[in-house]
Design a protein with these regions (language model features):
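A conserved acidic, glycine/proline-rich C-terminal tail/linker
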Residues: 179-241
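Anionic-ligand-binding alpha/beta catalytic cores of soluble enzymes and soluble regulatory domains
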Residues: 121-182, 186-189
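Active-site histidine-anchored catalytic micro-motif
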Residues: 32-38, 50-55, 65-67, 71-74, ...
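N-terminal glycine-/serine-/threonine-rich phosphate-binding loop
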Residues: 1-81
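Conserved active-site and cofactor/substrate-binding residues in soluble primary-metabolism enzymes
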Residues: 20, 24, 33, 48, ...
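Generic C-terminus detector
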Residues: 226-264
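Structural motif
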Residues: 7-10, 36-39, 68-71, 84-86, ...
Length: 264
């Protein structure tokens, strides 16, 4: 892949920022591709939470220019028999474990299983494939190397299960907003409806956070087109005791027929 601008490599991990792990990965990438521009998507994915990592990666990936390399490591199976993957689509390239983390990016992508050679041609450390396997592969892609030079093509990369039809909380963001899997366009048209979260009924829909009354949970359309449960000047997740995976209900309210006056 030919490039005129410096290559961009994003990083998404569950490593946190207290330790040196992220810096070691960045150092490895820059050692192999000094011109790379490194962008952190998140390093605060809950440890081993593949589903959360896939959600965050998928949401951010669409904002980057074509040719960006997305490096993602949420890898509770590191050192086991899961494969390491690199993928390429018309918009991006991606590197990560074959555990579903890259699943949202694999549609229409060519995928290879990485050859298990470390950054110095030897075997990678069993506990740190992020540094010794994935980072060098991402750097090679950023340099413009062809995908097939990294491994053998596969067609059975692990993909996530189909999105559940049951309304649920997909993600709780930094502000305590609960991002749901509810697409407002799929809510029955006509009449009134509300979202039931446990014992809490949420029916007030607002366009902006500033429109929300303080202290009252509201429904708002998020920037990714999904319905969110929010609380102005507070954390909806804490107040409503909601977490990722919690089920919700969308309830259509029946219209009340007008009262008929009795004849006197």
């Amino acid at each position: 892949m030919k490039r005129s601008a410096p290559p961009i490599v994003t990083l998404t991990t569950d490593f946190g920022l207290r330790d040196a792990y992220v810096a070691e990965m960045k150092g490895c990438i820059l050692s192999h591709c000094p011109t790379a521009v490194l962008v952190d998507i998140s390093h605060q994915i809950p440890a081993g939470d593949i589903e959360e990592g896939a959600f965050v990666l998928a949401r951010a990936a669409t904002s980057f220019p074509p040719g960006t390399v997305h490096l993602a490591v949420v890898d509770p199976g590191v050192g086991g028999n899961r494969r390491a993957l690199a993928a390429e689509s018309p918009r991006f390239r991606a590197v990560g474990p074959d555990n579903g983390l890259l699943a949202p990016l694999l549609d229409a992508a060519r995928v290879v299983a990485l050859d298990l050679d470390g950054s110095d041609g030897g075997q990678p450390a069993a506990t740190f494939h992020g540094r010794d396997l994935f980072a060098p592969a991402a750097a090679r892609l950023a340099r413009g190397e062809d995908l097939e030079t990294l491994g053998s093509f596969v067609t059975d990369a692990l993909i996530a299960a189909p999105a559940a039809a049951t309304p649920a909380v997909l993600h709780v963001d930094h502000f305590g907003n609960c991002v749901t899997n509810i697409d407002p366009r799929q809510v029955p048209a006509g009449g009134r409806w509300h979202v039931q979260a446990g014992k809490q009924r949420i029916s007030l829909r607002v366009r902006t956070y500033s429109e929300a009354p303080a202290g009252e949970p509201v429904l708002i359309l998020g920037s990714d087109g999904r319905l969110e449960i929010a609380l102005r000047d507070g954390r909806a997740a804490t107040t409503l005791n909601l977490a990722r995976g919690d089920r919700l209900e969308v309830i259509q309210q029946e219209s009340t027929p007008p009262r008929r006056e009795k004849n006197s």
